[in-house]
Regions:
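A charge-rich, low-complexity, intrinsically flexible signal that marks solvent-exposed coils, linkers
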Residues: 4, 10-59, 64-96
Length: 96
């Protein structure tokens, strides 16, 4: 009988913390400023989807362009590092 594959408990713990932080981010007492919202967005997208893909929104889609640019700055960042940064940002936000 083959042994069960080893679970990466550190990765599982990080994923659980990330999911808890994502839920907590939706329940903050005050709305974060736009710069913080962009950080949260970019860390979340990098953690869940990896490097940015597709074309940068153009024209008058200023919000879409800002989101794309924030996410693109994280190109090459590992998903785990992005998860850790997201968790830290949410913890900081909830302390304020």
């Amino acid at each position: 009988m083959a042994a069960a594959p080893k679970k990466d408990t550190k990765k599982d713990d990080l994923k659980a913390k990330f999911e808890a932080a994502a839920a907590a981010a939706k329940q903050t007492k005050k709305k974060p400023d736009n710069a913080t919202l962009l950080k949260l967005y970019s860390y979340y997208k990098q953690a869940t989807e990896g490097d940015v893909k597709g074309e940068r929104p153009g024209g008058f889609d200023f919000v879409g362009g800002a989101k794309y640019d924030a996410w693109a700055k994280l190109k090459g960042t590992s998903r785990d590092d992005a998860m850790q940064s997201y968790v830290k940002q949410v913890e900081k936000l909830n302390r304020e």
